[in-house]
Amino acid sequence: MEKITSHLWFDKEAREAAEFYTSVFKGSRIKDTATISNTPSGDTDIVTVELLGQEFTLISAGPLFKFNPSISFLVVCNTKEEVDALWNELSKGGKALMDLGAYPFSERYGWIQDKYGLSWQLIFFSGRAIRQRIVLTLMFVDRVVGRAEEAINFYASVFRNAFVGDIQRYRKGEEPDVEGTIKHASFTLEGQQFAGMDSAREHNFAFNEAISLMVHCETQEEIDYYWGRLSADPKAEQCGWLRDKYGLSWQVVPNIMAEMMKDKDEKRKARVTEAFLKMKKFDLEALKRAYRG
């Protein structure tokens, strides 16, 4: 499992969406399914999928949050035909944010919002070796526009095996974007590729809990470290969730939690659920005690 994985919050379509995405992205699969009972959202389905080699968690937890393009997933394709095939599937019931076609940076590219509202950028790079097929991309808008570079450097200071890669900046004449801010930047955290950008255009959206980043931890010391470095909004601290100073949502979770939630013993799962619903930062020993009963 990657150190950092993406968590997608659906109203009630997590299982349906998991089937859809694993059918669209060839060679993908559903890894695990579980249901957590007696949460504030009622019975909650959790589905773990592997898409093009990367893990995603999908949850059905009510209509509290909506996906928006502040976070999108860049899919790097081997051929232009693969771009077209993915576009044809993801565009069913969706809408184009940037039309499929040729651009100065790619012979074949398009940005699509699928039928669930999730944003995908599909791109073909000729002659380039592909190390990671899906790259989570952060767009800094409105109150955090112009802070993409600051945020990228901050994240690189928090995580290990991290560095900032290529940076493309806006030039004079590309208003409303400010000269020198980030047009596109690649960066690596825990050996995983990410991307970031600023956009000063008018947007009616921002980062929210519909997409959060899960940090998987082995020990309480790890949990304490990431929680202390990332959390910037005490009001957002709940059930392992936090919000950083840029508005991005994270979950700092113990690895053992996934195994607890897959347990066939409903009483054990219920005890763990009751315990973690009362927590802000996860207490690993308290979760183990609840599990043991």
Predicted regions and their residues:
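N-terminal/domain-start segments enriched in small and hydrophobic, helix-friendly residues
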Residues: 1-11, 50-53, 59, 66-74, ...
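Vicinal oxygen chelate
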Residues: 2, 31, 58-60, 81, ...
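Core segments of cupin and vicinal oxygen chelate
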Residues: 8-53, 107, 139-192
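Short hydrophobic/aromatic beta-strand micro-patches
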Residues: 9, 74-76, 139, 214-216
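Fold-core signature of tandem repeat domains
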Residues: 25, 71-75, 112, 159, ...
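Generic structural signal for short, solvent-exposed loop/turn connectors between secondary structure elements
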Residues: 34-46, 60-66, 125-132
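Residues that flank catalytic or metal-binding motifs in active/ligand-binding sites
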Residues: 45, 69, 132, 183, ...
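Hydrophobic-ligand binding "helix-grip"
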Residues: 64-65, 205, 209
